[in-house]
């Protein structure tokens, strides 16, 4: 997927960034002058934020400038506290600032907002008739934490049961649990590959994958996003050239992709990538954080959706904090690989194991999905999120928004581009009781700021229509409908009423 930014949009976006950058440096120059003239008065707000004599400043350079001059202007749009469960609607705590957004203070007031921000894909984050009683019982039996790692005293029967259930669910021989999704990638990848190995990573892979790849010590090469042809070209070059300087053969090669890319909502071209990897005898590692549970006829992710045999993906990673309403992550692979990880991965050996109630939540949610609770609620949830996602995406496109991603994906970003329009859109939606997430640089390229919508099975059709009406009105207000509006004679969704 290549996003072609219109020339006028690119020019105005760069102008906006340039304006903020220029005025930011101008203010810093005046502050430096004031610090020379009135050192004690101006030091308290120095750019480095560090006034202790004799100590090197901790916060310096471009990162410090970006935080002070760019992010501070919009930080009220991020990290908004909530005061309820992250269901289809939740309570957002109102905040205020008396110092130009340097600090934000919570009030006692809350706003009930439509939740288009959370990764609660199947709605399990709310109280559930099957899951919640079992989670409460596990809390009474095991307490909130094991206070130990899996290799010490933190290995409960629940952990063993969930590993077996995960392996069965994703159709792999074995699995390992970790207490955090991010750490699953950042800690597992260095345990799989090291110096003398080659990692070939998609250019838009998640930061946790990037961190894990860098920590591994392996050589890293990046292929064009979701481009199997470029992947094959890169593999041929690297295999023929060998390791840097010595030109010895690589000890192992690992290709890393995501099932659904979290900032694009785009499905991985898995069949084509698997074909290339098989041809050159290299290992595949797929992150299914946003796809497991959310796509596929029975919720088994991208492999099921695209008709790929799970045996063809050597290592499958997933998080438990999205579709399953809990926390943690897993790796599913062959028994030999999982045994190796259990003996070598620092997060497994030294890190505290998953909280038992969190483990029980995943067990219960997974059983609902599999229909082992004696109902068809799981199948209905999977059908509901597919219908909700495709309906919402279709309506956004009809309204003229530039929507990224593929059908069936519950992640649907639409382009905003201009850095001033992102916070304006977010704040105006919040005023109208709709919570959305703006995403900009450095999480995305400089020109490609966007709003990311996440859909849940817990959303009713009325909820989605309400969200579409607000998004359409605010989109008109801030001017982010970059595509022609589809002319149809029909529903109030295409021609939203004034709120």
From Swiss-Prot:
The protein's enzyme class: transferase
Reaction(s) this enzyme catalyzes, per UniProt: L-serine + hexadecanoyl-CoA + H(+) = 3-oxosphinganine + CO2 + CoA
Membrane-crossing residue ranges in chain numbering: 5-25
Location in or out of the cell: Endoplasmic reticulum membrane
Protein name from the UniProt record: Long chain base biosynthesis protein 2b
Stored PANTHER family: CLASS II AMINOTRANSFERASE/8-AMINO-7-OXONONANOATE SYNTHASE, LONG CHAIN BASE BIOSYNTHESIS PROTEIN 2B
Biological or metabolic pathway of the protein: Lipid metabolism; sphingolipid metabolism
Keyword rRNA processing assigned: no
UniProt function note: Serine palmitoyltransferase (SPT). The heterodimer formed with LCB1 constitutes the catalytic core.
Any Gene Ontology biological process: ceramide biosynthetic process
Lineage of the species this protein comes from: Eukaryota, Viridiplantae, Streptophyta, Embryophyta, Tracheophyta
Cofactor(s) needed for function: pyridoxal 5'-phosphate
SUPFAM superfamilies in the record: PLP-dependent transferases
Alphabetized GO MF terms: pyridoxal phosphate binding; serine C-palmitoyltransferase activity
């Amino acid at each position: 997927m290549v996003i072609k930014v219109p020339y006028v949009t690119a020019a105005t976006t760069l102008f906006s960034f340039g304006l903020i950058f220029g005025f930011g440096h101008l203010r810093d120059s005046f502050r430096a002058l004031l610090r020379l003239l009135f050192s004690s008065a101006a030091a308290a707000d120095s750019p480095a934020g560090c006034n202790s004599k004799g100590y090197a400043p901790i916060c310096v350079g471009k990162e410090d400038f970006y935080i002070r001059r760019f992010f501070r202007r919009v930080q009220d749009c991020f990290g908004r506290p909530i005061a309820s469960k992250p269901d289809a609607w939740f309570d957002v705590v109102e905040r205020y600032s008396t110092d130009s957004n340097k600090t934000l203070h919570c009030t006692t007031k809350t706003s009930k907002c439509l939740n288009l921000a959370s990764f609660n894909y199947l709605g399990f984050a709310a109280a559930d008739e099957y899951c919640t009683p079992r989670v409460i019982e596990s809390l009474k039996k095991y307490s909130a934490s094991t206070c130990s790692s899996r290799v010490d005293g933190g290995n409960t029967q629940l952990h063993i049961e969930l590993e077996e259930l995960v392996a069965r669910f994703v159709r792999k021989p074995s699995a390992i649990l970790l207490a955090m999704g991010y750490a699953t990638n950042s800690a597992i990848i260095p345990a799989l590959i090291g110096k003398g190995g080659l990692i070939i990573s998609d250019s838009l892979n998640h930061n946790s994958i990037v961190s894990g790849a860098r920590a591994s010590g392996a050589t890293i090469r990046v292929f064009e996003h979701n481009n199997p042809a470029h992947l094959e070209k890169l593999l041929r070059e690297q295999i023929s050239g060998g390791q840097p300087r010595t030109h010895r053969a690589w000890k192992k090669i690992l290709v890393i992709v995501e099932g659904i890319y979290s900032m694009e909502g785009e499905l991985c071209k898995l069949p084509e990538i698997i074909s290339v990897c098989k041809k050159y005898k290299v290992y595949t590692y797929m992150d299914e954080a946003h796809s497991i549970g959310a796509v596929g006829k029975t919720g088994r992710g991208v492999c099921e959706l695209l008709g790929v045999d799970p045996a063809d993906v050597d290592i499958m990673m997933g998080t438990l904090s999205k579709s399953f309403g809990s926390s943690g992550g897993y790796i599913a692979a062959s028994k030999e690989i999982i045994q190796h990880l259990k003996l070598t991965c620092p997060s497994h050996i030294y890190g505290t194991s998953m909280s038992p109630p969190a483990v029980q939540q995943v067990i219960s949610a997974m059983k609902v999905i599999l229909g082992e609770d004696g109902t068809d609620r799981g199948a209905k949830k999977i059908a509901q999120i597919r219908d909700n996602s495709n309906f919402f995406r279709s309506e956004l496109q009809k309204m003229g928004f530039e929507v990224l991603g593929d059908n069936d994906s519950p992640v649907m970003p639409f382009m905003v581009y201009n850095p001033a329009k992102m916070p304006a859109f977010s704040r105006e939606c919040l005023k109208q009781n709709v919570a959305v997430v703006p995403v900009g640089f450095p999480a995305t390229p400089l020109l490609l700021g966007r709003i990311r919508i996440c859909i849940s099975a817990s959303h009713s059709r009325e909820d989605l229509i309400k969200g579409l009406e607000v998004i359409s009105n605010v989109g008109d207000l801030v001017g982010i409908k970059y595509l022609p509006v589809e002319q149809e004679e029909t529903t109030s969704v295409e021609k939203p009423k004034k709120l």
